[in-house]
Amino acid sequence: MGKEDKTHINVVVIGHVDSGKSTTTGHLIYKCGGIDKRTIEKFEKEAAELGKGSFKYAWVLDKLKAERERGITIDIALWKFETPKYYVTVIDAPGHRDFIKNMITGTSQADCAILIIAAGTGEFEAGISKDGQTREHALLAYTLGVKQLIVAINKMDTTKWSEARFNEIIKETSNFIKKVGYNPKTVAFVPISGFNGDNMLEASTNCPWYKGWEKEVKGGKATGKTLLEAIDSIEPPKRPTDKPLRLPLQDVYKIGGIGTVPVGRIETGILKPGMVVTFAPSNVTTEVKSVEMHHEQLAEGVPGDNVGFNVKNVSVKEIRRGNVAGDSKNDPPMGAASFDAQVIVLNHPGQVGAGYAPVLDCHTAHIACKFSELLQKIDRRTGKAVEESPKFIKSGDAAIVKMVPSKPMCVEAFTEYPPLGRFAVRDMRQTVAVGVIKKVEKAAAGSGKVTKSAAKAGKK
């Protein structure tokens, strides 16, 4: 297959902190990945010097993580690996303290979640206990529209590759993911050792009893033996190129001799030079002079592309991180006066009532919003209302809440523009709730700034 023919997909790796996520992810990136041999050799040498030889795959990931946390410049190719069918990007390094926030504000939408479960005695039980991280992560993935799941049952070597233990874990995990919302029949369960490499890329000889995984897919069944094959059997995503443009800004740079360059990831639609874009909620309209990615000019940017684009006659003071760019002629973005959202309270020590005003992280925006009204309490499993106008909600509850941003922000309904329709509620330095936006009351549009070049381009 030619390099260009492969589809890009995003996976998110979830599971308990000691399940071996780093080692498993590191192994895939290491064996099929974007890390060049020189870097690997350098890492291995350092690991050996520090007596961490046994930890090499996780060590690779730790090095990458450290570099990523130091600055944004880390080559994102390092988080990629290739399968026969796909280019895979690992969206978040597991164990990252911002994992939940990242999942929701989602630098990108995952196409599939890989749940890593440790098979060791006691380890498995700890991972999916009632207060386990695993439950929270899986629930989060499902709520945020990650509908495909792979379960990798790791550290099988610690159970001496016991078939009975494997089957017991499948049974327990099936019940567990069913409660979250997944259908176990559509899930591949793969017994692996992320450290030794069993069933990662090649079928292991340590489990002669293992006949392979099987899952239901549209129009039939998929089967395979390894984790790599399970990743290859992910159904390819439909990318939202046909929707109107939405591009949340991550940063706005001023570049000498070029001018103002907003940077961000295209979530929906297409961005082309010559287009007239509107930034919300700043309400500034201008022409796009050029679009580039990785220092190369693009004829057009599509969803998933992280682009910089040059705009005319707009100063860096007028637009900022958290603004959203869209096509001025095709459902241009607008600020929100208020919005209704389905909110799930994850961990709040007290109870939440009307008037609560935490910070919301939605796409790249970070803005305080008031819970102005609790409309209904909802049964999380069925989505049906169980109480009208509740006074309070507490941890574990789901509710429809009317929210009012403290200053202008641009959000959308999750059904129309998913990446702009989900958010994390942050308070006391943690994620206390997550939400999905049901409907948006747009702010009355005042007359905004329209640059000369936009007016001219608009007449063309």
From Swiss-Prot:
Subcellular location: Cytoplasm
Family: Belongs to the TRAFAC class translation factor GTPase superfamily. Classic translation factor GTPase family. EF-Tu/EF-1A subfamily.
GO molecular function, one term: GTP binding
Region annotation (G5) ranges: 193-195
Protein name: Elongation factor 1-alpha
Chain spans, region G3: 92-95
Positions contributing to GTP binding: 15-22, 92-96, 154-157
CDD domains per record: EF1_alpha, EF1_alpha_II, EF1_alpha_III
